[in-house]
């Protein structure tokens, strides 16, 4: 099994022992690494030249899937040695997110796109079927995005750990959406900033629903930041203060064995400011009490992180866990002591970047995106 690190793909792996294989989705392909001793050694690049949004390892079939911002899904049936296009039925839509779950004992893979549509495949990506009701919720005509072409996208997909019919997606910018019938019908979850970034149901406490949305573009009365709902999304509570160090909260996860152990990362301000400030000023934070209090993690990390952290992954095993964080500078930070101390295990590969975010922090003269 692989640890998959990408902006819109799998963020949690579990098993009896720690994983020693890492795949990083970047603007220039999937970079593969193998852990030997205390270092992560390069194993080459898969599908070079393609900007990957998402990577998923489907455990029952041992298949790998990668989605790109150039409207392709690639699949590998031999642990990454060979890849082939498998996106028939999706059309010319950018792939922003991938996820998988078991439905009736068989693997089902989901793909979220820009414009915001949701698809699924029951044959390991050989054919895809749309769940069209996602676009039949009230207000879909208001879905948008700050940067051109001003089209919303499905940024995040999550499933109920005990009921595969319950699916949540985050549409940026459109809101958090919920289905209780496997995607046949959808409702929009209100009472939270509709600039939806991520949504997650923790495996060990499915009564909770977590979501992230930036505090940088809404009033103080609107729940935003790192938020929790205990009633399926009917009401939300912000678990981070308005002056939280991370205003543009994005990737996060919950430890599968401890629902109170949370990690979140992101920039101080939104992408529209990065070019002017020449920095995203990103950070990683940890809560041990379900979000009541937070620690900004600094041990071993650069004093100032200019790049944004756009992907995080956790590998949990019996007796421990490791955290990986990928940046728009192509660096990967790593901790195996609960985030107290970090190492930069990979430097200067392709940027780990949602769409064009990395260009906001790149050389002058390039077009800025949001």
Where are these regions (language model features)?
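Extracellular glycan-interacting surfaces
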Residues: 1-370
């Amino acid at each position: 099994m692989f640890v998959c690190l990408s902006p819109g793909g799998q963020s949690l792996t579990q098993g009896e022992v720690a994983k020693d294989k890492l795949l990083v989705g970047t603007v220039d392909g999937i970079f593969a690494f193998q852990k030997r001793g205390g270092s992560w050694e390069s194993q080459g690049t898969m599908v070079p030249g393609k900007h990957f949004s998402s990577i998923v390892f489907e455990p029952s079939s041992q298949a790998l899937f990668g989605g790109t911002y150039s409207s392709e899904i690639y699949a590998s049936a031999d642990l990454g040695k060979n890849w082939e296009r498998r996106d028939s039925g999706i059309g010319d839509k950018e792939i922003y997110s991938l996820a998988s779950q078991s439905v009736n004992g068989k693997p089902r893979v989901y793909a979220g796109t820009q414009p915001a549509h949701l698809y699924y495949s029951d044959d390991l990506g050989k054919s895809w079927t749309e769940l069209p009701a996602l676009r039949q919720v009230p207000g879909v005509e208001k879905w948008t995005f700050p940067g051109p072409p001003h089209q919303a996208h499905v940024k995040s997909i999550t499933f109920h750990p005990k009921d595969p019919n319950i699916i949540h997606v985050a549409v940026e910018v459109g809101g958090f959406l919920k289905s209780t019938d496997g995607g046949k019908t959808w409702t929009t979850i209100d009472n939270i900033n509709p600039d939806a970034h991520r949504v997650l149901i923790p495996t060990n406490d499915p009564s909770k629903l977590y979501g992230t949305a930036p505090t940088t573009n809404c009033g103080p009365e609107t729940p935003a930041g790192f938020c929790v709902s205990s009633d399926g999304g009917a009401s939300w509570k912000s678990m981070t203060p308005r002056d939280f160090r991370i205003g543009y909260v994005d990737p996060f996860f919950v430890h599968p064995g401890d629902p109170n152990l949370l990690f979140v990362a992101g920039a101080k301000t939104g992408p529209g400011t990065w070019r002017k400030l020449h920095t995203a000023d990103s950070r990683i934070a940890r809560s041990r009490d379900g979000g009541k209090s937070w620690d900004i993690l600094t041990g071993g990390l650069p004093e100032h992180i200019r790049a944004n952290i756009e992907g995080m992954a956790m590998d949990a095993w019996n007796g421990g866990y490791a955290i990986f964080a990928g940046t728009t500078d192509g660096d990967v930070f790593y901790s195996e002591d609960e985030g107290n101390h970090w190492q930069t295990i990979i430097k200067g590969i392709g940027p780990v970047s949602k769409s064009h975010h990395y260009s906001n922090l790149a050389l002058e003269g390039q077009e800025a995106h949001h």
